[in-house]
Amino acid sequence: MSSPLQLPNASEPQVLEHLVVRPITEDERPLWNTKVADHHYLKNATLVGEHLCYVAEYQGLWLALLGWSAPARHLRPRDTWIGWSKEQRAARRHLLANNARFCILADPHQLPNLASRALALCTARLSADWQERWGHPILAVESFVDGQLFRGTAYKAAGWQRLEDTRGFGRVAEDFYVRHDRPKQLWVCALEANALEVLRAPQLPPELARFERQPPPPRPRCRVPTGRLVSLLDILLDVLPDPRHPKGRWHPW
């Protein structure tokens, strides 16, 4: 991991006042990936589904990196916080985003408030940027914090709310989870004052109704009763002749 960036000629108030948070350009993505892989404890910059990458910079110097991606599919504390139904979650989950990567490149002792400032500036513009890139707004955000490594102070200072910790499972396939026994802090934040009311409303308001998605059709299920299901091997043994010539001694099974 690289050493924290030092700013010997700048005070924290000066840096925070002139801090700029913006989406990275396509040409900057390789550098962003490299720095995230170098500084983030997960050691990779992979983002799932719809996503946006940001940099917080001061006079052209990259001080922090933020990555947003699709939210978790099933998250009981978050779903309880919102108060939506399973059907509403399926149709509106894309209106949430997950702060999947957050790296501070500058010395946190020199700039202790950089993280919360960068986070606040980023969430202030996230919905508009998301709509420009992905065609719909973001109403609320979530993030997981490894409590064994971090305290979540930046999220608290930026106005986020901590819910109960996760149960220590990680998704390893489309809808398959395994226990890793490392529960995470769950932090959430509504980007609009009425975001939760909108997400759990029977109908979205007219200006948001066009963003509601139709749930996918149910997966086809086998309609053959269990008693009628037989082994494919048994069928093949009855149909296909054995090409081997009987030789040697036969032994009973």
Please tell me what each predicted stretch does.
Residues S2-S3, E197, P206-L208:
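Active-site- or DNA-interface-adjacent structural scaffold in DNA-acting proteins
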Residues E12-L16, K35, T46, P243-R244:
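Compositionally biased, charged N-terminal/linker segments
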Residues P205-L233:
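Short, cationic low-complexity segments
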